[in-house]
Amino acid sequence: MKVEILCVGTELLLGDILNTNAQFLAKEFGAMGFSMYHQAVVGDNVERLKREFELAINRADIVVTTGGLGPTDDDLTKETAAEYFNKKLIFHKESYDEIVKFFNKIGKEISENNKKQAYFPEGCTILKNDHGTAPGCIIDENDKVVILLPGPPREIIPMFRNYVIPYLRKYQEGTIVSKVLRVCGIGESGAAEMLKDLIDNQTNPTIAPYAKDNEVTFRITAKAESEEVAMKLIEPMERKVRERLKENVYGVGDTSLEDVLGAMLIEKKLTIATAESCTGGLLSGRLINYPGISEVFMEGAVTYSNEAKMNRLGVKKETLESYGAVSSETAAEMAKGIAKTAGTNIGVSTTGVAGPGGGTKEKPVGLVYVGLCINGKVKTRKLNMPGDRQTVRNRVVNAVIDWIRREIINL
């Protein structure tokens, strides 16, 4: 079946808000085995909304809209769908009671306008909103399925997964299951070359690489009569990928690098502290994303100036004068210094030129040195990271987290 996404909202059209809903829905429908050929964004204009809605209905079997279910006069998605199917909007008391309950819970008074959110096209299936005041609905008629969802991602995601996916199961031909392997430390072309025969000869399951910021993902997808059978098809392919890419595969699904490292540090009872210059606390911020990291993360120091490096970390003045702040020698002393002062098993440091200015011929923008002290033994690495200031910093942090992960695998 063909699916089309229609996102409603002037704020999306003008780029004021990033349209993450379309990305989320496209991935979900793809994982379920539906085909998608069109997406559209339309502002809060009723005539243009009607035209786009009719175009979508004529092209697709399933049309999903996001937004336009609010209480204001320009929230007209339900009205547009009801008019197309020649249906009345009917008041649904249970939904209204849930809206009232939501307002009571957050200590706010409900306005008369919010009553509008409890009106739905006659005969539709109502989708409960567990995280907001705008319930969704499904109109399933004349060989067309129209799914109306609210705009906020925090409301769409649980509504889609809890209510829409179960509803659409009857339209799936068999079961499609995907497993995502996350890879870092190797580029998309290099990883794809190592798996070339698997990619070239794929049937069921299929395997597809996707380049993302600082990493690559491989989605393995199988189609079968049941989820259990599909997973059995995926397993041999996953084994082959892992055998070839080895420790470059760091996780599955939505697992992040910091999740993996955090779990390893806790399991191995290894404490860690950070000393950052060019990354300015970004590394420690990533590490503390992992719940429970307080067991092993002792502290993070942002030592931007030479004085801070000397006073806080014990970096020698002679080192800074002879080699400069951006050097392997300084990175080594920073890592050793933070491990010593924090009393941790691991100390890690970053020092470099993030840009856009400050670079020289000898030390250009993107040059970064990182240091790693594990149980008193110090190593350093030289990195050359392309991109703007934020990109350089993000890439350095990813590289450092991955480096620590690889170093402690066999400890």
Curated annotation (Swiss-Prot):
InterPro entries: CinA (IPR050101), CinA-like_C (IPR036653), CinA_C (IPR008136), CinA_KH (IPR041424), Competence-induced_CinA (IPR008135), MoaB/Mog-like_dom_sf (IPR036425), MoaB/Mog_dom (IPR001453). It comes from the Bacteria. Belongs to the CinA family. NCBIfam families: cinA_nterm (TIGR00200), molyb_syn (TIGR00177), PncC_domain (TIGR00199), PRK00549.1 (NF001813). This is Putative competence-damage inducible protein. The gene is cinA.
